[in-house]
């Protein structure tokens, strides 16, 4: 049957909305056709039509918001957007006069295909043999289900004008066709009517109903230029959608890029030049920042497997006046770049990251794949140089943060549950995976720092060659016993003998007071320190030197966390034989560090001896390492009690003789070596009762006992002043 049933109009609701930007069309065309290099197909008439030049209807009076639309922008409006039903019928019948004239209504001859074809449907989808049937089709299947906005109707369109995905080389990928609407403001093509209503509503909320917005959209280029840390990059229009773009760029990862830059800047002070690799370049912004700000101190290699990303990286290099080296040959495009000492050469490669890391050796490797990075760890440690640095950014937070526990077991081979310290647990899982990969290559690691924020988990380690270092690293991977009632935790004791009652290792007595099994075994995890204080202080100095103000608060928090010292009690004294830079009460060492002698060592034999001495020194300094994990003060607050301020509680814990500091993992977390029982007792001691809540529930203790009421009467301010702490 040639005619289309009227009930088959509604679009498939499973199709997603796609947005396109119209491009200028020739002035002579009655219906605008976009340029060939855009991601937009035109709205053609049927193939058999001779496509005569139809005279447009007289322009109706525009609404107040669209009254100032210029004629050029008005001509670019899609044919499915009309003000009256008569205007839509004029497109179908092709008459300049009234569509109700006898000449148009009585043209029931099937041979006149131009007057019997719907302008919004392809010929193979609908053909009418009478003008009455065509008018009924336009009214019922296009006009009645349209979306109205300020006097205009956005009718449903069945033409092959859905956008296609463009590429840099000009290729186009076809997309699934279907019924859709054209937005009158931004020319977006959206499949569902409800989505179109919400789309227009968002335009109204943003105030994007003026004609200048239409003109700005048409003049918008295909690629956008962004700037971050004095580095310009060119990105695709859909750069923020990793599933739909060839080169993903996430502005929320700015903190990650800055802290990695500080890491490389601190490493560049040790030896020059450094062979650096950004294994997953995408837009190349990270490698561009290295080469632009560190100059000749680094030799940057940016790699990506996608051909379009490699082309974009090369464009971004020339945009920042950096020379591109492809296959060890300088690539010259256009005018010769000026010879500036601050500009460096960037080698751009296109190959699998595992292959590249097997072929070449580097001093600094950064891995930032889409998802987990465990598939690239073996290759990274295979050829990395001694005392080099490997940084790993993991964005599979659903598995690391215990939302997809089966994925964590599959990728990292560990058992994990959601705990109050889940972010540090995620960091220790990644470090354990890195340590196992290094040990398989007869290498050990020294963790410089580990950061776990909302969008990523970043781990930076230094590589120590030799089987001795590998064995020492492997011993630091242990299982964790976690109590599910009170959330007390402790690493299992070393040894291979099976313990009769593993619950005795926990400081709590929940197993004796609670029925059933109360604890679970998590891991394997990294059980040693997560921070190197000396390296973090050098990173802080580099951040101050390069003016990276956004990252300085995080690095300061990491320094206090590594020393497990409150910020108000941080040590301001340092040996006189070191060069120091003071910043907010913290002395930053610039030439002295625990491993600074190793960096200046020349020769493989001497550096290996220095690495062994470093391992021995780390073993003696194990007692001064920060305590593992932290407690959330809100998680352990007492019902019916007002807990003290966080800074005041830190002072109280320090007064009781415990090491204490805040943590970047949790804004309300406290890292301390106090057991949970002592933590709760001190929290109870300095909490004040909520009298209304306590009286209503009958929880007010008797006055004769030494309870919370008696403890509150103690002068907290006097004790704080006696210990040198200020009351907040």
Swiss-Prot record:
Zn(2+) binds at residues 483, 486, 508, 510. The modification Phosphothreonine is found at residue 23. Disruption phenotype: Mice are viable and show no apparent anatomical defects. However, they display significantly altered motor coordination and aberrant exploratory behavior. It is found in: Nucleus, Nucleolus. Its EC number is 2.1.1.-. Residues 224-683 form the Trm1 methyltransferase domain. Keywords: Isopeptide bond, Metal-binding, Methyltransferase, Nucleus, Phosphoprotein, RNA-binding, S-adenosyl-L-methionine, Transferase, tRNA processing, tRNA-binding, Ubl conjugation, Zinc, Zinc-finger. It comes from the Eukaryota. A zinc finger (C2H2-type) spans 181-203. S-adenosyl-L-methionine binds at residues 257, 304, 352-353. Its main location: nucleus. This is tRNA (guanine(27)-N(2))-dimethyltransferase. It comes from Mus musculus (Mouse). The gene is Trmt1l.
């Amino acid at each position: 049957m040639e005619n289309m049933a009227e009930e088959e109009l509604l679009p498939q609701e499973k199709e997603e909305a796609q947005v396109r930007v119209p491009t200028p069309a020739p002035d002579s065309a009655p219906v605008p056709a976009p340029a060939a290099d855009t991601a937009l197909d035109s709205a053609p008439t049927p193939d058999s039509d001779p496509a005569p030049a139809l005279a447009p209807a007289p322009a109706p009076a525009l609404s107040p918001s669209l009254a100032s639309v210029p004629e050029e922008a008005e001509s670019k409006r899609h044919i499915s957007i009309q003000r009256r039903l008569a205007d839509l019928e004029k497109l179908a019948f092709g008459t300049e006069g009234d569509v109700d004239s006898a000449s148009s209504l009585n043209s029931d001859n099937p041979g006149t295909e131009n007057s019997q074809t719907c302008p919004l449907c392809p010929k193979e989808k609908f053909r009418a043999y009478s003008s009455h049937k065509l008018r009924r089709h336009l009214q019922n299947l296009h006009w009645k289900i349209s979306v109205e906005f300020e006097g205009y109707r956005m009718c449903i369109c069945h033409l092959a004008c859905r956008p296609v995905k463009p590429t840099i080389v000009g290729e186009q990928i076809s997309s699934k066709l279907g019924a859709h609407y054209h937005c009158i403001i931004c020319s977006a093509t959206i499949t569902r009517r409800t989505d179109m209503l919400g789309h227009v509503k968002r335009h109204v909320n943003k105030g994007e109903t003026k004609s200048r917005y239409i003109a700005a959209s048409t003049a918008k280029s295909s690629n956008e230029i962004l700037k971050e840390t004095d580095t310009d990059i060119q990105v695709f229009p859909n750069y923020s959608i990793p599933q739909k773009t060839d080169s993903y760029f996430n502005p929320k990862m700015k903190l990650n890029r800055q802290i990695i830059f500080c890491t490389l800047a601190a490493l560049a002070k040790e030896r020059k030049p450094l062979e650096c690799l950004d294994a997953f370049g995408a837009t190349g912004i990270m490698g561009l920042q290295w080469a632009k700000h560190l100059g000749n101190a680094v030799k940057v290699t940016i790699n990506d497997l996608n051909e379009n990303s490699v082309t974009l990286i090369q464009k971004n290099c020339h945009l920042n006046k950096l020379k591109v080296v492809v296959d060890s040959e300088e690539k010259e495009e256009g005018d010769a770049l000026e010879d500036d000492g601050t500009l460096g050469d960037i080698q751009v490669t296109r190959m699998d990251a595992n292959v590249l890391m097997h072929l070449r050796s580097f001093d600094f490797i950064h891995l930032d794949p889409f998802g987990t990075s465990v598939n690239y760890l073996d290759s990274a440690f295979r050829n990395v140089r001694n005392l080099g640095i490997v940084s790993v950014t993991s964005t599979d937070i659903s598995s690391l943060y215990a939302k997809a526990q089966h994925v964590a077991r599959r990728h990292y081979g560990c058992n994990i549950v959601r705990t109050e310290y889940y972010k540090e647990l995620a960091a220790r899982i990644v470090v354990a995976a890195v340590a196992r990969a290094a040990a398989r290559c007869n290498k050990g690691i020294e963790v410089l720092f580990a950061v776990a924020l909302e969008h990523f988990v970043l781990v930076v380690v230094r590589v120590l060659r030799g089987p001795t270092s590998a064995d020492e690293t492997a011993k630091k991977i242990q299982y964790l016993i976690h109590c599910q009632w009170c959330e007390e935790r402790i690493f299992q004791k070393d040894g291979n003998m099976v313990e009769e009652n593993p619950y005795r290792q926990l400081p709590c007595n929940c197993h004796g007071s609670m029925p059933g099994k109360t604890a679970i075994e998590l891991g394997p995890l990294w059980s040693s320190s997560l921070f190197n204080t000396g390296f973090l202080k050098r990173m802080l100095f580099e951040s101050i030197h390069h003016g990276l103000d956004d990252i300085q608060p995080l690095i300061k928090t990491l320094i206090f966390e590594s020393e497990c010292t409150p910020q108000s009690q941080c040590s301001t004294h340092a040996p006189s034989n070191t060069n120091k830079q003071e910043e907010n009460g913290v002395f930053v060492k610039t030439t002295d560090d625990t491993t600074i002698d190793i960096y200046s060592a020349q020769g493989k034999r001497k550096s290996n001896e220095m690495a062994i001495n470093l391992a021995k020194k780390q073993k003696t300094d194990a007692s001064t390492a920060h305590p593992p994990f932290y407690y959330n003060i809100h998680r352990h607050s007492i019902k019916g009690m007002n807990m003290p301020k966080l800074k005041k509680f830190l002072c109280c814990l320090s007064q009781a003789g415990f090491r204490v500091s805040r943590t970047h993992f949790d804004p309300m977390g406290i890292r301390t070596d106090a057991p949970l029982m002592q933590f709760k007792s001190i929290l109870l001691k300095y909490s004040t009762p909520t009298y209304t809540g306590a009286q209503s529930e009958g929880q007010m203790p008797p006055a004769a006992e030494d309870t919370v009421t008696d403890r509150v009467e103690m002068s907290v301010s006097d004790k704080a002043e006696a210990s040198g702490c200020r009351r907040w």
